[in-house]
């Protein structure tokens, strides 16, 4: 008989933030939420969400940060159009699909780069994706195969990372049951010339729980993940260019065919992304 587990309940959290300003005040609620955000997924160019001729929803950075462990599955399942099927607790494989479609018909992007696997089985597991540098998640609901190909028949989920706007650094730590912990560190540099740089790292580890109840107590669904992201760029009124790298790797224990012994899976994903644009006029951006 198999058991169903919910994601680990957090029992403690610490956060230390260091920035240019010694005191940080909460923004007024009316300013914290952007009522008409700028999106790029629908037409591959920046436009207001209200002007997009398609159904699209946006998850803001504030909503992402409400999940202390920055788990993509937990963030996405708040949207009614997203179906999440998780095979156990933290770090176990998760299927993601849009509006009742097949997993392989939902496209996952980060800054325009595809994160779907090459075998047509759909996006890489959301558990293996680092959200520490993500500022916005756009969910395009409905067929988008004309823009993105056959694996976007159900829709597109895109993770957007924006450029840093001020110099500063932060350190965050989270601890929970089953010896679960996650640490994140990030540092940004911005100067008046338009140059900027950002670097961050994260580590998550948990002992997990037994996947099925016939297993020995020592056979647990452990998960170990670490990664980093770095970005440099230059931006002014005419030119915008950047080079970014995102590396994520680790191991997770899982069970196959309800056997009594767990197997170990190693995972690694690396994303290198170069972007450049030139504003030729007020109406033309190349």
Report residues per predicted region.
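Periplasmic-side early beta-strands and strand-to-turn transitions of outer-membrane beta-barrels
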Residues: 158, 166-167, 174, 186-267
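Residue-level signature of outer-membrane beta-barrel architecture
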Residues: 100, 161, 189, 234-236, ...
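Short acidic/polar hinge/loop motifs at secondary-structure boundaries
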Residues: 113-141
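N-terminal Sec signal peptide and the immediately downstream disordered periplasmic leader
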Residues: 1-67, 73-77, 188-189, 226-228, ...
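Hydrophobic, lipid-facing positions within transmembrane beta-strands of outer-membrane proteins
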Residues: 36, 94, 155, 169, ...
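Extracytoplasmic beta-strand/coil segments of soluble accessory domains associated
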Residues: 73, 77-113, 135
